[in-house]
Amino acid sequence: MAGDDHLISGLYAITDAHLMPEPVFLARAEAALRGGARILQYRDKGDVVTDARRRRMQAGALRELCAQYGALFVVNDDPRLARVVGAPALHVGAEDAPPAALRAQFGRAILIGVSCYGSVPQAQEAATQGADYVAFGSFFASPSKPQAPVVSVDVLTAARAMIDLPIVAIGGITEANGRALIAAGADALAVISGVFAAEDVEGAARRFTALFNNRKE
């Protein structure tokens, strides 16, 4: 989806099954969108076979919600689900299919994001293979991934100088530390607990969004 790089900016909210149990799943997702989330990723680690129907229904509903709010919908780690629900974007990790293989499968019909953890060379390779954006982190201790290694904020500065793609920062991001990541070069902040663990999801999303509204150009 050439020309859509501008879609990767602002608050990038990521769903969590524990923080968003099924009875309130869509309501909490919509609250984040009302609060200004520009991107919403469906991240669900349920079994792709036994949970297939639920995953398909949730992903399809999120795609419709995102379209209603003008936000980008992303499926995490599941190319088949992305195709089934017509997701406009797919995010993968280092263990998943490489960007070149996904690009061959989907063509330019989908945005592809790649987790690069703390590796700028890995991000450069992803860019060469056709990725549309790259993600780095965890930058801080993360309640969602407590075992994830913490990487230096300097990675963002180095990547910004060497890679001509939108950059997403992830991992333990809060309203207090997010501004420094934006200043270092992050185009978007990917947040799970900071948004969906909040009692007021919409309010939390608005505060994260304000970090971008208030940044110096």
UniProtKB/Swiss-Prot annotation:
Source organism (scientific name): Acidithiobacillus ferrooxidans (strain ATCC 23270 / DSM 14882 / CIP 104768 / NCIMB 8455)
Chain positions recorded as 2-[(2R,5Z)-2-carboxy-4-methylthiazol-5(2H)-ylidene]ethyl phosphate binding sites: S142, P143, S144, G172, I192, S193
EC number: 2.5.1.3
Alphabetically ordered keywords of this record: Magnesium, Metal-binding, Thiamine biosynthesis, Transferase
Gene of this entry: thiE
Example of a GO cellular component annotation carried by this entry: cytoplasm
Residues at which Mg(2+) binds: D77, D96
This protein's pathway: Cofactor biosynthesis; thiamine diphosphate biosynthesis; thiamine phosphate from 4-amino-2-methyl-5-diphosphomethylpyrimidine and 4-methyl-5-(2-phosphoethyl)-thiazole: step 1/1
Cofactor binding annotation: Binds 1 Mg(2+) ion per subunit.
Entry superkingdom: Bacteria
Protein's UniProt name: Thiamine-phosphate synthase
MF-aspect GO terms: magnesium ion binding; thiamine-phosphate diphosphorylase activity
